[in-house]
Curated annotation (Swiss-Prot):
Coiled-coil portions: none
A Pfam family the protein falls into: TsaD
Sample GO molecular function, one term: N(6)-L-threonylcarbamoyladenine synthase activity
Purpose: Required for the formation of a threonylcarbamoyl group on adenosine at position 37 (t(6)A37) in tRNAs that read codons beginning with adenine. Is involved in the transfer of the threonylcarbamoyl moiety of threonylcarbamoyl-AMP (TC-AMP) to the N6 group of A37, together with TsaE and TsaB. TsaD likely plays a direct catalytic role in this reaction.
Gene3D superfamilies: 3.30.420.40
Localisation per UniProt entry: Cytoplasm
Reaction catalysed by this enzyme: L-threonylcarbamoyladenylate + adenosine(37) in tRNA = N(6)-L-threonylcarbamoyladenosine(37) in tRNA + AMP + H(+)
Record-given protein name: tRNA N6-adenosine threonylcarbamoyltransferase
UniProt cofactor(s): Fe(2+)
Organism, as annotated: Mycobacterium ulcerans (strain Agy99)
Gene name linked to the record: tsaD
EC number(s) on file: 2.3.1.234
Family recorded in the similarity comment: Belongs to the KAE1 / TsaD family.
Length: 343
């Protein structure tokens, strides 16, 4: 099989991912396998991810996911092994990092330690090809960042981030307020489709003239939803969901488009789990069109955590002839977003 075969493992939170991609001689990527096993059902009754349960689930799921991926890709061993090194849950990361190092050593192939958040940005390469200079809006359960990305191989510049709750975290908290359970992203998105986004106008945090134009705040929005629900016992859940979702999408897209136009950058990339949200995608498409920006968003399957995105970032490192990471590099639960490769 021509090209360089890269196998990557993702275990930063509650999804066990194994992705296998082929880096072609011309730099293009061919995704050969994308296996994901989620432990979300085991966390539902706790209303959020329990780190110990997530770690044990990774231990149980990784071996079978690896075998399925190798079979699907039709290979016996890859040319390169990569893994998420951080950020994420400490125990969950250790499972994937230890496994990836063991596989790399046993197969005698190079090992690359990859930033989970950089992987989210790289996932779009499967959809739209090499990433040009862009402003990236990275939105997930634990992170909300605006980044200036010149290329995947250069250090990213953080333009702003949330000062409190991440966007995905706000979704989960509002879903609990409405009695919708965990996780909240998809269920709120689905419910909002039958609601009126103009029926309840919730506040847009950090949008005043004196506020940081690239910073975000969703704690006040969450509190506003809680106060509304308490004051209106007969509230219509679909309208609350629609109003909340409209506020989130409005702030995210408004600030991202403004950042791109302000920097004179012609491309906006939206990545991370929240990028799968239908209203965010719709409003971003509209506002980028109005601003003359090219919008890049991966398909929803590639927005959530997976091994394919880690393989994509590792492929960029291999193509750039970056030195492999040492096998003694430790996992880093608090790894900053601006650092793509570790070691």
């Amino acid at each position: 099989m021509p090209g360089t075969i890269i196998l990557a493992i993702e275990t930063s939170c509650d999804e066990t991912g194994v992705g296998i991609t082929r880096l072609e001689a011309d730099g293009t990527l061919t995704l050969l396998a994308d296996e994901v096993a989620s432990s979300v059902d085991e966390h539902v009754r706790f209303g959020g991810v329990v780190p110990e349960i997530a770690s044990r689930a990774h231990l149980e799921a990784l071996g079978p996911a690896m075998r399925r991926a190798l079979t699907t890709a039709g290979i016996v061993r890859p040319d390169v092994v990569a893994t998420t090194i951080g950020p994420g849950l400490a125990g969950a990361l250790l499972v994937g990092v230890a496994a990836a190092k063991a596989y790399a050593a046993a197969w005698g192939v190079p090992f690359y330690a990859v930033n989970h958040l950089g992987g989210h940005l790289a996932a779009d390469v499967y959809e739209h090809g090499p990433l040009p200079e862009c402003v990236a809006l990275l939105v997930s359960g634990g992170h909300t960042h605006l980044l200036h990305v010149r290329s995947l191989g250069e250090p990213m510049v953080e333009l702003g981030a949330t000062v409190d709750d991440a966007a995905g975290e706000a979704y989960d908290k509002v879903a609990r307020l409405l009695g919708l359970g965990y996780p909240g992203g998809k269920v709120l998105d689905d419910l909002a489709r039958s609601g009126d986004p103009d029926a309840i106008v919730f506040p847009r945090g950090m949008t005043g003239p004196s506020d940081d134009p690239c910073a975000f705040s969703f704690s006040g929005l969450k509190t506003a939803v809680a106060c509304y629900v308490e004051a209106h016992p007969d509230f219509r859940p679909a309208d609350v969901a629609a109003g909340f979702q409209e506020a989130v999408a409005d702030v995210l897209t408004r600030k991202a488009v403004r950042a791109a136009t302000g920097l004179g950058v012609s491309t906006l990339l939206i990545a991370g789990g929240v990028a799968a949200n239908s209203r965010l995608r719709e409003l971003a498409t509209q506002r980028c069109s109005e601003a003359g920006l090219t919008l890049r968003i991966p398909r929803p399957r590639l927005c959530t955590d997976n091994g394919a995105m880690i393989a994509a970032f590792a492929a960029h490192l291999v193509a750039a002839k970056a030195a492999p990471s040492p096998l003694d590099v430790p996992s880093d639960p608090g790894l900053p977003v601006v650092k793509g490769q570790v070691g």
